Regions:
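Cysteine-nucleophile protease catalytic domains, especially the papain-like/related folds used
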Residues: 30-119
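...with weaker cross-activation on analogous glycine-rich loops/strands in unrelated enzymes
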Residues: 96-170
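Extracellular/secretory pathway and lumenal proteins
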Residues: 9-11, 15, 26, 79, ...
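Active-site or metal-binding loop neighborhoods of secreted/extracellular toxin and effector enzymes
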Residues: 156-241
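Intrinsically disordered, low-complexity regulatory regions of eukaryotic proteins
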Residues: 1-33, 38
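Intrinsically disordered, low-complexity coil segments
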Residues: 17-18, 68-83, 89-93, 115-118, ...
């Protein structure tokens, strides 16, 4: 079945194939997520074409538009490229994730804000992020996982900044679980339970939108179950022309 129209929460129409909107709202949607001008470009090839990048970066690093050269070098030295991902909360000293602790919105937001105090601002769909920052979104499957998405720069000729995502080591995509463009993360489909994925997930809790720095130094850190391989990194975000 197709996903719902993402224009308005009150619209119950199905979205057109591959689109975020129903037939009625393809012509005009009265709502939009305003752009700050600092949104990253949607460049799936930059993340998907090289396995040392794709296998070592997850939704968190993708939402920050960070490619960590140390992850790539470590992957080249490991035949299986089995490395821990960057995780929210690792920088600020939160314990590693385990299979029993729920990934709730309050817990994940505390981890996100704790890594970069005063740099990350809670936001909303129709609120414009300050210049030099742009919007990401957080959803969770409380039993299993968290997931971040980011708003991208519009395509030439368009004024709409759609969202894109990268699930774990999977390729980057600008479509939701039902193959529709992502206009409003809160109204898009994140139920991967019926897909061919090996790890069925249903991110059924929307935690909110956040504005994150795009040109200032920002901290993230890896953390996982593979020994104590945890590396802190300070990244200078740069605008890609």
């Amino acid at each position: 079945a197709p996903g719902r129209c993402q224009c308005l929460a009150t619209c119950t129409n199905d979205a057109l194939k591959g689109e975020a909107f129903c037939k009625e709202h393809m012509k005009f949607c009265p709502r939009s997520a305003p752009l700050s001008g600092s949104e990253p470009r949607y460049e799936p090839g930059r993340w998907n074409n090289d396995d040392t990048v794709r296998l070592t970066h997850n939704c968190f690093s993708y939402s920050y538009n960070i490619i960590d050269p140390r992850q790539i070098e470590a992957c080249k030295k490991d035949p299986k490229c089995d490395l821990p991902f960057h995780q929210p909360g690792s920088k600020s000293g939160y314990p590693r994730f385990n299979n029993t602790d729920p990934k709730t919105c309050p817990n994940m937001i505390a981890r996100l804000m704790g890594d970069n105090p005063k740099r990350i601002l809670p936001s909303s769909f129709e609120l414009k992020c300050p210049r030099g920052t742009s919007k990401i979104a957080l959803v969770v499957d409380e039993d299993q996982d968290y997931h971040f998405l980011r708003q991208d720069k519009p395509k030439p000729g368009s004024k709409t900044g759609f969202f894109s995502q990268k699930s774990g080591a999977m390729p980057v995509t600008n479509l939701d679980a039902k193959g529709h463009k992502i206009f409003d993360v809160a109204l898009a489909d994140h139920n991967f339970d019926n897909s061919k994925r090996k790890d069925p997930l249903n991110y059924d809790h929307f935690c909110g939108y956040f504005c994150i720095p795009r040109h200032d130094p920002i901290f993230i850190k890896t953390g996982g179950s593979r020994g104590e391989l945890r590396r802190e990194a300070k990244f200078k975000q740069t605008r890609r022309k």
